[in-house]
Amino acid sequence: MESDNLQDPQEETLTCSICQGIFMDPVYLRCGHKFCETCLLLFQEDIKFPAYCPTCRQPCNQRYINDISLKKQVFIVRKKRLMEYLNSEEHKCVTHKAKKMIFCDKSKILLCHLCSDSQEHSGHTHCSIDVAVQEKMEELLKHMDSLWQRLKIQQNYVEKERRMTLWWLKSVKLREEVIKRVYGKQCPPLSEERDQHIECLRHQSNTTLEELRKSEATIVHERNQLTEVYQELMTMSQRPYQELLVQDLDDLFRRSKLAAKVDMPQGMIPRLRAHSIPGLTARLNSFRVKISFKHSIMFGYNSVRPFDIRLLHESTSLDSAKTHRVSWGKKSFSRGKYYWEVDLKDYRRWTVGVCKDPWLRGRSYVVTPTDIFLLECLRNKDHYILITRIGREHYIEKPVGQVGVFLDCEGGYVSFVDVAKSSLILSYSPGTFHCAVRPFFFAAYT
């Protein structure tokens, strides 16, 4: 048998150096050190692969490897120790001098076969110790797996919140630069209004940043509470089988179920409030042109890769939810400055912007980020998001009426304006494109 070929290892070779318990799902790193899989992932307080070995501190340049052989040895040794315990004289039935090979689930004790037939235990549920151990371990592992999946989801929320905080800081910094650029084009200069606008932006940024950090702390707290229950389950699963069987785990299992059902914090969605720029719409209206959207093309939309968009033939059916009819202007622009407005009131989803003129004349051509310059509003569950051609979300208040589009061909950029509030939504960087572009828009109620 396989067990006969495996030598009984020393105690220290079965012990995880992190939890100091017997290995559960042992894995080893390139340096050769071995740990419980979950202990390794929880080592840095984040459920992710550590940057270095907890024992020798060598960098972890690759994923760990599951040690199947050691896992088998752990099982065999635990089973062997259980049998040694049951065969020992001190643990035999005092009354009948027989081995206690039967487990009473009601009393949570080990019995010999004669005691199990006694009147005291006649109405109780009995099973062999092998079956009892298997069932107890299966239930423990089931609870552990449920919490582990929950922990991974919560860790994703933690990482998402941290990414959002970093992007928020970057977004506010970029927006401050754009606002300075916009005010610099106003005539006469509005230095005082610009400074007030930037001060308001920074104040809102700091307030939101504090809320983001509180949100992250709440999610981390919830994750840590789950981790505590998980580690209790893990500690119990590492107990010798004979001790595990007689433990009353009802309270631990109850807390595990409650922890798995607690609503997880979803994190916050930050938004910059629209701030009016004096004279903005008046200045832009000096470049106003009338755009006729008379033609239409077909867009094939890939929800997995939102900007993998294809031009389709006019006869293509619109039955598919991934296919949309998009209106575009009769004229393209390569020189000058132009401003127009698109009424998007009441639309749940819309896209407005410009795209390279040669691209529109193609057939079955995939859009790349260098072909199209847009602002897109999407409904994401219970909130709206604004994104640009690179698929990056912008944490800006959604406009509720007309959206103004300012195209500067010499500067090579396009800007979007909330007309009702005379505020800047966002602006592409100067030099983004140097080619003929054509206006387009798409809007849908659903």
UniProtKB/Swiss-Prot annotation:
Domain called B30.2/SPRY: residue spans: 271-446
SUPFAM superfamilies on file: B-box zinc-binding domain, Concanavalin A-like lectins/glucanases, RING/U-box
Zn finger residue spans: RING-type: 16-57
Residues that, per the record, bind Zn(2+): 93, 96, 115, 121
Family label: Belongs to the TRIM/RBCC family.
Zinc finger (B box-type): 88-129
Name used for this protein in its record: Tripartite motif-containing protein 43C
Annotated keywords: Metal-binding, Zinc, Zinc-finger
Listed PANTHER family: E3 UBIQUITIN-PROTEIN LIGASE TRIM (PTHR24103)
Coiled coil residues, start to end: none
A matching Pfam family: zf-C3HC4
InterPro entries: B30.2/SPRY, B30.2/SPRY_sf, Butyrophylin_SPRY, ConA-like_dom_sf, SPRY_dom, TRIM/RBCC, Znf_B-box, Znf_C3HC4_RING-type
GO molecular function, one term: zinc ion binding
Keyword presence, Zinc: yes
Transmembrane segments: none
